[in-house]
Amino acid sequence: MEKYIMSLDQGTTSSRCIIFNKKGEIVSVAQKEFTQIYPKAGWVEHDPLEIWGKQAGVAGEALNIARISPEQIAGIGITNQRETTVVWNKRTGMPVYNAIVWQCRRTAGYCDELREKGIDKTIKEKTGLMLDAYFSATKIKWILDNVEGARELAEKGDLLFGNIDTWLIWNMTKGKIHVTDYTNASRTMLFNIHELKWDEELLEILDIPKSMLPEVKPSSCVYGETDEILFGVSIPIAGDAGDQQAALFGQTCFNAGMAKNTYGTGCFLLMNTGEKAVDSKNGLLTTIAVGIDGKVEYALEGSIFIGGAVIQWLRDELRMVKTAQETEKYATEVEDNNGVYLVPAFVGIGAPYWDSYARGTILGLTRGAKKEHIIRAALESMAYQTHDVLKAMEEDSGIELKALKVDGGACQNNFLMQFQSDILGVEVDRPEVVETTALGAAYLAGLAVGYWKDRNEISQNWAISRSFAPAMEDEKKEKLIKGWHKAVTKAMDWEERE
């Protein structure tokens, strides 16, 4: 009987299930979108019960599509939207409030209060994170302080907290297992990434009872088994990692200096720094890459706010293209950018500049500038921003970038990938299987149940669809980068400060 690994990929807009075979190839995919709830401006919520229902539904669907029985699943891996916060009553299994999503800004004011007290330095030292409403800690506090009766229940030990991974595992095991992994714990702003435990001082500052928190385990180990009611048989739940860390693992970035970039609406860059937690001087996050083989490995993380979103803007607002795919054709119809730079700082600019008052700008326009040059400049902006973050990572870690592995929608754009390689001066590798997030969770589960022997075996699975090698002369590259940096300085400090 042939065996497979099931991966539950619980994202921000949809719940998916992907089944993989021994070669790391996709056997079947099932996906369902769920409701985005916006109670007020800047607030974002999900219904945890809807997420669980849809996630269980797609698991059954993926088995049907693949025409395999639950007995053929050797293990289940879970990967999830990180930071999103669920608090539920352990006696009833019911959430006391909707899940507060990572994008939600409702606790920004409270974060400012903590910053005024200098707590941000303590948080950075212990958790590797910047004090921000993005992470789970202030979301938990908000629920305890604003939902009627929540704090009393928590003090009595009746409430549980979890990110989406914990919530899914709790439901899959019918409330037997309350657990998370090191990668998800490292995004709560409550976990000491050096001592590998929940931090008592931070819990005290935020007034969060420790009894609410899940047990923290490696990313690859058997946490428990699914309740038989789910599939008719018990299946080991054996892998768990936050989505970006799962993608790093799925891209087989197992050694220090290996990095991946996910080109989505924004871009997420992670670089493996090995067993060393690197403190960033450039405003990057220090995070846990994976907990495996009796140890944890660390990563530096940088995000770019506007990646593929700049292409959506060209399509929807400027109406320069009908589809995102057309941008490649237009960009290659001109020899170069003709001196045109586009800085997509629509919502400010992130690492390593960190200027929330920057705004988008197009510079270097002359009478010879055409639509094609603007489209090309938009694509190039993704590569320049990636370059800036990776250079900051190299500087922080003292580790030289060896190659960049890519995934996400925009990695299908060959012009962009070639330009990325030219600007970085390293090889850019696009894999055969671009579902690297789900694949990473599958690998973590498969290793724990012995489906794959070790990381070497997995590395042999990793197949390149296309590799892009740098082909630009150094002088030209330096000139382009200099032009980009000049453009960024013009975009900065534009919006009036209140």
Swiss-Prot record:
GO terms for biological process: glycerol catabolic process; glycerol metabolic process; glycerol-3-phosphate metabolic process. GO terms for cellular component: cytosol. Pfam families: FGGY_C, FGGY_N. Glycerol binds at R82, E83, Y134, D243, Q244. Sn-glycerol 3-phosphate binds at T12, R82, E83, Y134, D243. ATP binds at T12, T13, S14, T265, G308, Q312, G409. It catalyses: glycerol + ATP = sn-glycerol 3-phosphate + ADP + H(+). GO terms for molecular function: ATP binding; glycerol kinase activity. Keywords: ATP-binding, Glycerol metabolism, Kinase, Nucleotide-binding, Transferase. The keyword Kinase applies. ADP binds at T12, R16, T265, G308, G409, N413. Pathway: Polyol metabolism; glycerol degradation via glycerol kinase pathway; sn-glycerol 3-phosphate from glycerol: step 1/1. Its EC number is 2.7.1.30. Activated by phosphorylation and inhibited by fructose 1,6-bisphosphate (FBP). PANTHER family: GLYCEROL KINASE, SUGAR KINASE. Homotetramer and homodimer (in equilibrium). Belongs to the FGGY kinase family. Key enzyme in the regulation of glycerol uptake and metabolism. Catalyzes the phosphorylation of glycerol to yield sn-glycerol 3-phosphate. This is Glycerol kinase.
